[in-house]
A protein has these predicted regions:
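Bacterial N-terminal signal peptides
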Residues: 1-7
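Sec/Tat signal peptide C-region and signal peptidase I cleavage site
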Residues: 10-15
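N-terminal mature ectodomain segment of secretory-pathway/periplasmic proteins
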Residues: 17-92
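Short structured motifs
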Residues: 21-24, 51-53, 128-134, 187-190, ...
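Solvent-exposed coil/turn segments that connect beta secondary-structure elements
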Residues: 42, 59-61, 69-71, 84, ...
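Acidic/charged, solvent-exposed loop-and-adjacent secondary-structure segments enriched in E/D, K/R, S/T
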Residues: 90-120
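Gly/Pro-enriched, hydrophobic low-complexity segments
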Residues: 95-99, 119, 141-236
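Short, conserved active-site entrance elements at the starts or edges of catalytic domains
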Residues: 111-149
Length: 241
């Protein structure tokens, strides 16, 4: 689900760069060879708020492993993505399951993200064609809106919109749509911070637009790029107690 976090740091402004080229540079900034993240997933379902903590290791766009550390109900839950497959291990059942088919559309641990969102980590410039929108930004003064159209009819979100600060060249908001054009997800990117050569959002707020009064906030407490990751983290053998 880390394709939500794209930003770009460079010279010039968005209008001077073709939309597709800008998207390629966004990808270049996002996709380090490897990443490690420690974060908090704060889930507000409109009635109560609960916080999950997790560590995640990512290699390129095809492999990732997440280990949930708290609260007690989710402690020990693990998720492993390799290519186009996603497995989940829960200590309560002491077994792993392959998340596929209709299961991918279900809410991930009660959050505003689906398991399909977890599978959306790919380079946007590879999966989408980009154009600049003529729509004016009412939410963010001076922002430019990028329209993204999926190249493959099987892509989960056929269209997206991204609000970009043309000076800092960072993403402020993203919207994701169904094939019908119905708005499904909205994401806000906040608390940008310089990490190495990257400008990265420390906070992201997700909203499932098919639900009422819910939101899921992801707080990144630790972010490290280009680290060495043991091979065992991307093996199914890690999906056990």
């Amino acid at each position: 689900f880390l394709s939500f976090f794209f930003s770009f740091v460079g010279s010039g402004i968005a209008e001077e760069i073709p939309a597709q080229k800008l998207l390629e540079r966004v990808d270049e900034n996002l996709w380090a060879n490897t990443k490690f993240v420690t974060g908090r997933l704060i889930i507000d379902n409109g009635r109560k708020v609960r916080t999950l903590t997790q560590d995640s290791w990512m290699e390129g766009t095809t492999r990732s492993y997440s280990h949930y550390k708290s609260p007690a109900r989710e402690k020990g839950t693990k998720m492993l993505k390799i290519g186009g497959k996603l497995w989940m291990y829960t200590p309560r059942t002491d077994r792993k399951i392959l998340i596929a088919g209709h299961l991918l559309r279900q809410s991930m641990l009660g959050s505003d993200l689906s398991y399909e969102d977890m599978m959306e980590d790919h380079k946007l410039s590879y999966s989408y064609s980009a154009t600049f929108s003529t729509q004016s930004s009412e939410d963010f003064a001076g922002a430019r809106i990028l329209n993204l159209v999926a190249r493959d009819k099987k892509t989960t979100y056929q269209t997206r919109k991204a609000w970009i600060d043309p000076e800092k060249q960072i993403v402020l908001k993203e919207e994701r749509f169904a094939k019908s054009g119905k708005l499904l997800k909205r994401i806000l990117f906040e608390d940008y911070e310089k990490i190495g050569t990257r400008l990265f959002p420390r906070t992201m707020v997700f909203r499932d637009m098919l639900k009422e009064n819910t939101k899921t906030t992801y707080k990144f407490d630790v972010i490290e790029f280009d680290i060495e990751i043991p091979a065992k983290y991307f093996s199914q053998s890690i999906l056990k107690r």
